[in-house]
């Protein structure tokens, strides 16, 4: 079993350049319209993704929203994804947010292009699960965390072999955050463990833990 802690040193060493259903127009998306959450709520879905493009999610200041994707048939499944139904923004505002991916795949995928932005203006943002990738962004996508984020990928019980990557930014995609706290744990079958891959992408953080 391999463990990784994402620190400024690790960043320098690891740089690689190379149960709720909502009606909607796309059956592969759980939430495809604006939503307000006044109380603590957990949404578990086996869709292709839970939150699709063109959506604003507002969480009450004292509330916590958990979004869990447990799709076991699609290794491309995600929790949040821009570009799945065209170029359009996604925004999260308000209280506490937890995004969890159970199974292979990715927690956040941003590939909507230059006209898409993924913005987190939440009190706290936690990304966790057994996915092989935390954030995967390309095609000039913009991902912004106003108050930072924590990423914890724990694949210690996984039996599928993958290349585990915390953050991958390619094709002029950029990620901006006040801080990033990242921990990666690979399973025995996984072939590699990398904190961040920059393939013509940009990563900017005021603080790394």
Report each predicted region and the residues it spans.
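Gram-negative bacterial Sec-dependent N-terminal signal peptides
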Residues: 1-22
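Surface-exposed loop/turn motifs in large extracellular/passenger domains
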Residues: 26-27, 32-38, 45-68, 73-209
């Amino acid at each position: 079993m391999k463990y990784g802690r994402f620190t400024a040193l690790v960043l320098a060493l690891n740089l690689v350049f190379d149960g709720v259903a909502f009606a909607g127009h796309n059956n592969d998306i759980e939430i495809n319209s604006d939503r307000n959450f006044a109380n603590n709520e957990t949404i578990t879905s086996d869709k292709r993704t839970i939150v699709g493009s063109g959506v604003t999610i507002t969480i009450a200041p004292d509330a916590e929203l958990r979004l869990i994707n447990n799709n076991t048939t699609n290794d491309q499944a995600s929790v949040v994804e821009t570009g799945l139904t065209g170029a359009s923004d996604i925004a999260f505002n308000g209280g506490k947010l937890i995004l969890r991916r159970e199974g292979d795949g990715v927690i956040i995928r941003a590939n909507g292009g230059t006209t898409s932005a993924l913005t987190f203006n939440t009190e706290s943002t936690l990304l966790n699960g057994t996915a092989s990738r935390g954030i995967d962004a390309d095609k000039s996508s913009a991902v912004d965390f106003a108050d930072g984020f924590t990423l914890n990928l724990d694949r210690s019980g996984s039996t599928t072999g993958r290349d585990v990557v915390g953050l991958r930014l390619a094709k002029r995609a950029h990620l901006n955050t006040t801080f990033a706290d990242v921990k990666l744990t690979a399973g025995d079958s996984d072939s590699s463990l990398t904190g961040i891959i920059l393939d013509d992408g940009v990563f900017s953080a005021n603080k790394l833990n």
